């Protein structure tokens, strides 16, 4: 939140921070749920195993965000993701990769916004951003190894 908004009586910094953390929490939790659903539909055990490993990472990130939100006095809303997109493994992998990239973009945007005012939250978001960056090659591997013409 900018200085002018604070001077004019805009929303509190804590409320805005919590709202953004909740958005990030929802994105992490939704990604984890979708990756597990994708793993259940995977054609090959090694793909399912890789997707479940990615889901574990996303669940851990959602847990870190949940703890931070609760520590700030915020509440955790239920997460009800939209249906899993894609008609085959390749389409689902592409959707998951795009969602991971979009989630990372928002994380770094939030981290840089909150850095001077909320360093603990900014460090947490930057840490999740970095860890998500390490997983992008796994998403790419699933996309590359999937047949775009195969049917489920």
Residue positions per predicted region:
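Non-heme di-metal
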Residues: 1-152
């Amino acid at each position: 939140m900018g200085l002018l908004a604070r001077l004019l009586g805009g929303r509190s910094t804590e409320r805005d921070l919590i709202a953004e953390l909740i958005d990030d929490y929802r994105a992490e939790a939704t990604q984890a749920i979708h990756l597990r659903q994708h793993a259940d539909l995977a054609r090959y055990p090694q793909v399912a195993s890789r997707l479940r490993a990615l889901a574990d990472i996303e669940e851990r990130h959602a847990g870190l965000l949940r703890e931070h939100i609760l520590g700030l006095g915020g509440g955790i809303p239920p997460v009800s993701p939209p249906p899993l997109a894609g008609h085959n493994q390749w389409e689902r992998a592409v959707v998951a990769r795009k969602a991971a990239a979009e989630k990372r973009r928002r994380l770094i945007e939030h981290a840089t916004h909150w850095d001077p005012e909320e360093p603990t939250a900014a460090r947490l978001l930057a840490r999740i951003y970095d860890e998500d960056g390490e997983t992008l090659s796994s998403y790419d591997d699933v996309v590359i190894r999937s047949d775009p013409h195969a049917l489920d």
